[in-house]
Amino acid sequence: MSEWLRFLKRDQQLDVYFFAVPRLSLDIMGYWPGKTGDTWPWRSLIHFAILAIGVATELHAGMCFLDRQQITLALETLCPAGTSAVTLLKMFLMLRFRQDLSIMWNRLRGLLFDPNWERPEQRDIRLKHSAMAARINFWPLSAGFFTCTTYNLKPILIAMILYLQNRYEDFVWFTPFNMTMPKVLLNYPFFPLTYIFIAYTGYVTIFMFGGCDGFYFEFCAHLSALFEVLQAEIESMFRPYTDHLELSPVQLYILEQKMRSVIIRHNAIIDLTRFFRDRYTIITLAHFVSAAMVIGFSMVNLLTLGNNGLGAMLYVAYTVAALSQLLVYCYGGTLVAESSTGLCRAMFSCPWQLFKPKQRRLVQLLILRSQRPVSMAVPFFSPSLATFAAILQTSGSIIALVKSFQ
């Protein structure tokens, strides 16, 4: 276990932090794209089938509760069902774009570990972003794991409390998540196996969104690192000529070639960002919609079960997990946007006036292109910390408004 969680320690090698959480989560589920992405492990299809059964039975149970006008039970059922349904969509798209994800990961790794860009400050930038991404990614995974474990332990804890209070007449076993199951599976001797199966569907959801969302944030963090590495490269290019008033033809030629190399790499990073954003468009859009629904359902659950300590704890855990997932997407988008515009400021602060008019066009080209931030926006949503703050503000306002009517 300690070997798996080495990325939480300080002073580890870069390869320990690099895609640590997504690799761990997706590899367990069989969805890590690997070097080529042209093979589908059997466990990926098995986990897809398990979650598909869980989603279908959970949605059916939620609709049945709605039909009987049991609103509280319906919300308790549909809240995890919505998360699982979106996770099932993520699983399908991860398989659909498995080869593309592998290509993107290899291209990112090739750009990030280019031997021509191995200055100490550039290595520090890569290490800082990798360590930060690993630790932030671990937060939504651990929050989701706690939420799922709370759901799975709830029936056992209630049974223990009833047993200790000698309330045997009220003793009834029920499953962690409300699912429509054949009666034969809810009776002895099959009930323990049914309980384990239903509990496991929750962990499939947790590890899949931890891996899929973690892959998104890790990719954004390393795209940000690439932009910052370019900034460091530009500053190091001009550093020897800070005190010069004029450059020789040889110096101009060398600097021009380096400048062209920076522009080529800048274009490659932007192309990679767009390619990645296109593959994650549906996932990002579905995630924002589902997170909004989960937060809404959870708020209603809190307001209706406010006096129930265990119900309130489930609400808090679910809301923290949903907000953690949103934070991963929003912070990732902010990192990419801010670091891409930082390249413009770094270029402008250098003594670019040493160039001749012909070479200055390269500088103007880079400044013009980097003035517009590289966006991870999808239809209707733009992942950024401003969006995350607006969601928090809206959620708080709705809670305060509903509380005032009680």
UniProtKB/Swiss-Prot annotation:
Gene Ontology CC entries for this record: dendrite membrane; plasma membrane
Its biological purpose: Odorant receptor which mediates acceptance or avoidance behavior, depending on its substrates. The odorant receptor repertoire encodes a large collection of odor stimuli that vary widely in identity, intensity, and duration. May form a complex with Orco to form odorant-sensing units, providing sensitive and prolonged odorant signaling and calcium permeability. Involved in the behavioral responses to esters, and specifically to ethyl hexanoate, benzaldehyde, and acetophenone.
Residues bearing glycans: 178
Ranges in coiled-coil conformation: none
Tissue-specific expression: Expressed in olfactory sensory neurons in the antenna.
Gene Ontology BP terms: calcium ion transmembrane transport; detection of chemical stimulus involved in sensory perception of smell; monoatomic cation transmembrane transport
Keyword Ribonucleoprotein found: no
Protein name: Odorant receptor 10a
Pfam families according to UniProt: 7tm_6 (PF02949)
Gene: Or10a
InterPro entries, alphabetized: 7tm6_olfct_rcpt
Membrane topology designation: Multi-pass membrane protein
Cytoplasmic side: 1-45, 96-143, 211-281, 330-372
Protein's organism: Drosophila melanogaster
Subunit structure: Interacts with Orco. Complexes exist early in the endomembrane system in olfactory sensory neurons (OSNs), coupling these complexes to the conserved ciliary trafficking pathway.
